[in-house]
UniProtKB/Swiss-Prot annotation:
Organism this protein belongs to: Trichodesmium erythraeum (strain IMS101)
SUPFAM superfamilies (UniProt xref): EF-Tu/eEF-1alpha/eIF2-gamma C-terminal domain, P-loop containing nucleoside triphosphate hydrolases, Translation proteins
Subunit structure: Monomer.
Annotated GTP binding sites: 19-26, 81-85, 136-139
Start and end residues of each stretch annotated as G1: 19-26
Protein name: Elongation factor Tu
CDD domains: EF_Tu (cd01884), EFTU_II (cd03697), EFTU_III (cd03707)
Recorded GO CC terms: cytosol
């Protein structure tokens, strides 16, 4: 059977549902697909479909994630929902499912709970830029004042973590009521059912409040070097996948990381032995570099637009440490532990200087299965930036995954 062509006629945005266990994330995901399916903009997915999320691996870590897609009038969305709390933590830290924005689901009957707070903190740390709120289970709250109180609490909580708590859109409704109405009558249109309308107005807010992400091709050029060859009579070629931006012959790039930063001019761009006018984000290319010897370049360096990225040795990060069952360590580790940090394309040794818990207290040690904030000092400077993902490895196996939350030096 021929594969259906992906129609790129609308801008694409990645979002996900986050929030405390049993507040209704998966039911809301089902309600969104069902209410948009009634308008022919999605394939209806029920709770059981989404809840039976397949396992996938990201940076050596197994995560259960459900991916659904749907469209609104102006956009195409890929939506990720995770069955378990640990899956969210792993997902957000590894960046397995990048989110341009999130829908935070809070049960109006219970108000914000510990995981509500933890997911907001994670969203902040890993760089989910925008959040829209759905106050679920509105049908279980008779008292209008109680609803307002929960809304106030949620806004304060978001402001605590530097989100724009005062202006974030909040929509109240009941995902379950919408799902039940749509199960009984899958063709419900706008204005025919109050609960379905609330889901549609949530999606209007998502459309309006979550900005269109800047596409990778529009960002400054960056490619992490995977391999280096010298071609007799032509010069030195660095290969890798272009992470962002575009590159063409005659442009100047900087070689950043491990050694001192140097400039070079690109004299050729090739992909699969064919000459390209221009390499773009996502392409695997070989770049021919003027005036470079094979020994000047090594795996783990990056080629980037001049001045767009700088090498650093010290950073703060948010890390998930694998459990023994996930192939991680069997024992805890302590400050000054020196594993390898796999950053883009290479391992760099680094010392973990200190650990901090969510409440700011200093932790003495880290157990497998923990999520922790850690300060890392690398032995060589490499090109790193805020929001970048990395893996922590020991003897070739992954023992943790992290994201850079702040550059120190």
């Amino acid at each position: 059977m021929a594969r259906a062509k992906f129609e790129r006629n609308k801008p694409h945005v990645n979002i996900g549902t986050i929030g405390h266990v049993d507040h209704g994330k998966t039911t809301l995901t089902a309600a969104i697909t069902m209410s948009l399916a009634a308008q022919g903009k999605a394939k209806a997915r029920n709770y059981a479909d989404i809840d039976a999320a397949p396992e996938e691996k990201a940076r050596g870590i197994t995560i259960n994630t459900a991916h659904v897609e749907y469209e609104t009038e102006g956009r195409h969305y890929a939506h990720v929902d995770c069955p378990g709390h640990a899956d969210y933590v792993k997902n957000m830290i590894t960046g397995a499912a990048q989110m341009d924005g999130a829908i935070l689901v809070v049960s109006a009957a219970d108000g914000p709970m510990p995981q509500t707070r933890e997911h907001i903190l994670l969203a902040k740390q890993v760089g989910v830029p925008n959040i829209v709120i759905f106050l679920n289970k509105q049908d279980m709250v008779d008292d209008e004042e109680l609803l307002e109180l929960v809304e106030l609490e949620v806004r304060e909580l978001l402001s605590d973590y530097d989100f724009d708590g005062d202006n974030i859109p909040i929509v109240a409704g009941s995902a379950l009521q919408a799902v039940e109405a749509l199960t009984a009558n899958p063709g419900i249109g706008k204005g025919e059912n109050e609960w379905v309308d609330k889901i549609l107005s949530l999606m209007d807010e998502v459309d309006g409040y979550i900005p269109q992400p800047e596409r990778d091709v529009d960002k400054p050029f960056l490619m992490a070097v995977e391999d280096v060859f010298s071609i007799t009579g032509r010069g030195t070629v660095a290969t890798g996948r272009i992470e962002r931006g575009k590159i063409k012959v005659g442009e100047t790039v900087e070689l950043v990381g491990i050694k001192d930063t140097r400039n070079s001019t690109v004299t050729g761009v090739e992909m699969f032995q064919k000459i390209l006018d221009e390499g773009m984000a996502g392409d695997n290319v070989g770049l021919l570099l003027r005036g470079m010897q094979k020994d000047d370049i090594q795996r783990g360096m990056v080629l980037a637009k001049s001045g767009s990225i700088t090498p650093h040795k010290k950073f703060e990060s948010e890390v998930y440490v694998l459990k023994k069952e996930e192939g991680g360590r069997h024992t805890p580790f302590f400050p000054n532990y020196r594993p390898q940090f796999y950053i883009r394309t290479t391992d760099v040794t680094g010392a973990i200087e200190s650990f901090t818990a969510d409440d700011g207290s200093v932790a003495e040690m880290v157990m497998p299965g923990d999520r922790i904030k850690m300060t890392v000092q690398l032995i060589n400077p490499v090109a790193i930036e805020q929001g970048m993902r990395f893996a922590i490895r020991e003897g070739g196996r992954t023992i943790g995954a992290g994201v850079v939350s702040k550059i120190v030096e």
